[in-house]
Amino acid sequence: MAKKSMIEREKKRQRLVEKYREKRQQLKAAMADPNIDQATRMELHAQLQKLPRASSPTRLRNRCWKTGRPRGYFRDFGLCRNSLREMAHRGLLPGVVKSSW
């Protein structure tokens, strides 16, 4: 089980990413415009740099919603491999069956 502080830190990052998503996209789109001059591009870059560091989607880490484990994460379920296996054996994941061939 991950520390509570790590789980809460990740939740805070997710909130920040959502809060600044629109503004970040607008700034990046404006910077990508080939018709703007260099001074304007530098000003846009400065505005982008003023956004909180944690608001960048790159800083997000996928974590298991049950245990907070950051590794062995399955996107389809939002679970780590340990929790996925445990819940699948108990039949708590609809449509998941043991493999047999």
Swiss-Prot record:
This is Small ribosomal subunit protein uS14. GO terms for cellular component: cytoplasm; small ribosomal subunit. Belongs to the universal ribosomal protein uS14 family. Binds 16S rRNA, required for the assembly of 30S particles and may also be responsible for determining the conformation of the 16S rRNA at the A site. Coiled coil: none annotated. GO terms for biological process: translation. The keyword Repeat does not apply. Part of the 30S ribosomal subunit. Contacts proteins S3 and S10. NCBIfam families: PRK08881.1. Pfam families: Ribosomal_S14. It comes from the Bacteria. Keywords: Ribonucleoprotein, Ribosomal protein, RNA-binding, rRNA-binding. HAMAP family: Ribosomal_uS14_1. One of its GO terms (molecular function) is structural constituent of ribosome.
